[in-house]
Amino acid sequence: MKLFVLAAVLGVCLADRLDNKYLPPRGNAGAGFGPGFGGAGPKGGGSGFGGAGSGFGGAGSGFGGAGSGFGGGAGGAFGHGGAGSGFGGQAGGYSGAGGAGGYSGGASGQYSGRGGAASADANAQILRLNNEVTAEGFAYDFETSNGIRADAQGVATNGVQSQGSFAYKGDDGQDYSITYTADENGFVPQGAHLPTPPPIPEEILKSLEQNARDEAAGIVDDGTYRGEGAGAGVAGGYSGAGGYSGGAGGAGGFGAGGAGRAGGAGGFGTGGAGRAGGAGGFGAGGAGGAGGAGGFGAGAGGFGGRGSGGFGGAASRQYLAPNAGGRGSGSGNFNAQTGYQY
């Protein structure tokens, strides 16, 4: 039991110890990261962050060895500066070599890209400023000491209509100015230095002018080719003779007249006894047509035939005329019992 208690006490004591490798490297005697803000460093005789009688540094030491201090009164900052400098010194700043200038210097100097010289634009004064707004319109103008000028005036009748100008002096010493108008035609600026669009090529300009003349003359060009061979290949196809939508008189077609829709020799078939009948077809008129014998029409033996035979016939039970074989002449006699006879 005593051994257990002794081991526990020893373990607690060792647990409080921080190994050296977790600490920053130990510096020379008289310099280093001391532990306290108010007490002297452990082994450096006045080293550390908080030596008595000084700022962050020890009593005469800091980051940079003897005679320096992080905020000391007479040492150089980081070991680089001479007498009279320091991070928060009285007469120096973060300049490394002492003297005026720095981020947080004391009595003299400030951080500036021009060595402390005041910028002319930052210290510009307003020389003139007028701003008038009434029910009829507005007007304003101003001018500054560094060469900036602007003015504008306008009315709010039938929309805002205004005009004005703007000018300033560039870094090259030249004056740049713009005048403008803003009304129903939009914003139109003018100025010698404004970029201008490139000229239109001559060929494109001629084409635009020709298009304008054609439109004025009522000529409309939709881009369709109308030269040699235009329209070729339109004839034929479904609308040719004998096609599905043949014209009047097309042999064997659906069209009106001739052999086809309107009757005549041939129909949907090839004549003779068959689906289309002999001399007749889908159309009306003629033998086998809409009133002819053996056609699909309303003639004798047709689909809606009022005579004998056919789908609508009263006397015959056959639906189609018998196939006579080969190509018939289309001029036979029709019998309701036996069909066509040639």
UniProtKB/Swiss-Prot annotation:
Domain Chitin-binding type R&R: 135-198
Residue pairs linked by disulfide bridges in the UniProt entry: none
A GO term for molecular function: structural constituent of chitin-based larval cuticle
Spans traversing the lipid bilayer: none
Keyword Signal: yes
Entry GO terms, CC: chitin-based extracellular matrix
Entry keyword set: Cuticle, Signal
Compositionally biased tracts (Polar residues): 332-342
Record region (Disordered): 322-342
Highest classification ranks of the organism: Eukaryota, Metazoa, Ecdysozoa, Arthropoda, Hexapoda
Name of the protein: Pupal cuticle protein 36
Organism of this sequence: Manduca sexta
